[in-house]
């Protein structure tokens, strides 16, 4: 860790990693439920249960991966080995989710969906948690750390925009003929191919071009206990006993409900209620970007 100003290269490299994370999350929250329910034919109740179980597992895997990463010792540090490894299982999980075996029973399809989704959440967690921890360790200076996380947020939003434009303006309008593209299974092949490439490139670029900071990062404390589940649950219990953290979690819960509902159901509303064409849905995000800048300018004037 250093108090010196971080080079722009490091900030950009760190930030671009979140584009890969954003692409994965966009596909998961924006397409997976709709794809299994409308294309594959899995009942909505089972699809919802599968997503719910996967997200509950995610709540356990996040602190689990964080605890292991904190104690990990290697010549490549304690964050980068996870960052380098994560694209492999993430890519495999994305392919597994969108290409289940043919002629499966409803229960078999649900089981495949459940375990593939859990696999995806665990895989991207192996990047996300060490990556965020790395961002806090790149500098001792509060301002520098804030700048680093600003780059992270910008690239994260950029990932959502890239995926939205690619899917709704480039891919879906050009598939389906009389049908809208999101209801045609073949249209998802270029989407998953693009996502796998984007995720792999962004995560590896982030890991490769921040590895020169490894010698400057803090090493695991010598008095830190070896990983075990007892210490993990004690750490979780300690965090949950903090009143301020409880309030933060409550706020995040309501925010997650809002975002999850919007991302999962907006494709249904746009397709079946508003009956918008794919390209019309694609233009919605461009309007959001314009509104972001105009509202900021209006706020400055006020």
Describe each region flagged by the PLM.
Residues 2-295, 301:
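Membrane-embedded alpha-helical bundles of multi-pass transporters/translocases
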